[in-house]
Design a protein with these regions (language model features):
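N-terminal beta-alpha supersecondary unit
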Residues: 1-64, 206, 260
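Conserved hydrophobic/aromatic positions in well-ordered beta-strands
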Residues: 16-18, 127-131, 234
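A glycine- and small-aliphatic-rich helix-loop capping segment at beta-alpha/alpha-beta transitions
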Residues: 20-21, 76-86, 134-136, 192-194
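Surface "functional belts" at beta-alpha junctions
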Residues: 34, 89-206, 258
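Phosphate-handling active-site elements
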Residues: 49-56, 83-93, 108-111
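DPxDG-like acidic metal-binding loop motif
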Residues: 61-95
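Acyltransferase
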Residues: 198-260
C-alpha cells in the first residue's frame, strides 16, 4: 500500500507518501499560499522521494478542511483528478484531526491531556476541536480521541467549553496548535489559568501532509475509502458572499448581471 496525501488548507502546501511500514516521504513549500502553482511539483517530489512512480500509488488522500476555502478546493480537486486518472480510491481526512495528530508527540511530552487545534476564521471566529491525547493499551501507540465537536466556535466560546471540561480533571494541561494561536494568543493567555496551557512551536503549528498521510493509512487499512466523486470539501461555513446571498444582503449589482 502506498498512499499519497495532499495538504493545502493552510499557509503552506505539502504532499506526502506513506507506505505499509509507516515510512513517510514528504515535500513542502516555504511560500505562503502558493498551492495552485506548486502542488503538482510537490507531489512529484514526494513520489520521487518514496522511490516509486505515480502508477504505484494505491490511494489518494486529501485534507478536506476546514481552512482556506481556496486551498481546500485546490486540494480536493487535485485529489479527485489523480484518483480518477490512476483508478484508485480517495480518502478524506479532517484537517483538525490531522493537526491534532501532528502535535501529539509534543503534547504528550508536555504532559498535556488535551490537544486543541485552532484555525483562525477571523473576527474572533475559529474552526476548532478538542482531542484527548492517549496511549493505546499496549502503551506503544498514541491516539488523538475527539472529546469536543469539530465546528466553528467563537474563541471565547471554545475556551469556556474547554475550561469547563478541564475543571473536571484537576491539573490538566491543554496543548494549543494552529494559526489560531497567532491571532488569539492574548485571549487564550488571559482566559486560561497559568500553567494550564502550552502553545505549539511555529515549526509544528501549521498543517502538514505527513499527519494527513498517517491518518489516511489507518483509514485505508480500515476500508474507509471513497470514489473520486464522493470526496467532498468540509468548509464548516459558507463563504462570506454565500452567507450574504442567503441572508439577502448581497448587493443587487453583484447578484444580478448588469444589462449593457
Amino acid at each position: 500500500m502506498k498512499v499519497l496525501a495532499i495538504e493545502t488548507t493552510g499557509k503552506y502546501g505539502s504532499a506526502s507518501v506513506i507506505d505499509d511500514d509507516g515510512r513517510v516521504f514528504s515535500a513542502s513549500s516555504s511560500e505562503e499560499m502558493n498551492h495552485l502553482r506548486g502542488m503538482i511539483t510537490l507531489i512529484d517530489e514526494a513520489v520521487r522521494e518514496a522511490g516509486i512512480t505515480k502508477d504505484e500509488l494505491t490511494h489518494v488522500a486529501a485534507s478536506v478542511g476546514p481552512g482556506s476555502f481556496t486551498g481546500i478546493r485546490i486540494g480536493v480537486t487535485t485529489a479527485r483528478i489523480m484518483s480518477q486518472m490512476l483508478g484508485v480510491p480517495c480518502i478524506a481526512v479532517s484537517t483538525l484531526e490531522a493537526m491534532a495528530v501532528r502535535a501529539l508527540d509534543k503534547a504528550i511530552s508536555a504532559g498535556a491531556l488535551y490537544v486543541v487545534p485552532v484555525i483562525n476564521a477571523r473576527r474572533h471566529q475559529t474552526y476548532a476541536g478538542v482531542y484527548e491525547a492517549v496511549f493505546t493499551t499496549d502503551c506503544e501507540h498514541q491516539s488523538a480521541i475527539p472529546v469536543m465537536e469539530e465546528k466553528q466556535y467563537m474563541i471565547e466560546e471554545l475556551l469556556e467549553e474547554l475550561g469547563t471540561r478541564m475543571a473536571e480533571h484537576s491539573g490538566t494541561v491543554a496543548f494549543f496548535t494552529g494559526d489560531g494561536i497567532d491571532a488569539y494568543s492574548e485571549i487564550i493567555e488571559s482566559t486560561m489559568a497559568g500553567g494550564s496551557y502550552v502553545f505549539a512551536d511555529e515549526s509544528l503549528r501549521y498543517q502538514h501532509a505527513e499527519s494527513v498521510a498517517r491518518i489516511a493509512l489507518r483509514k485505508a487499512n480500515a476500508g474507509e475509502i471513497l470514489k473520486y466523486n464522493e470526496l467532498m470539501p468540509e468548509y464548516m461555513r459558507l463563504a462570506e458572499a454565500e452567507q450574504r446571498l442567503k441572508a439577502g444582503t448581497l448587493s443587487d449589482r453583484i447578484r444580478k448581471p448588469v444589462k449593457i
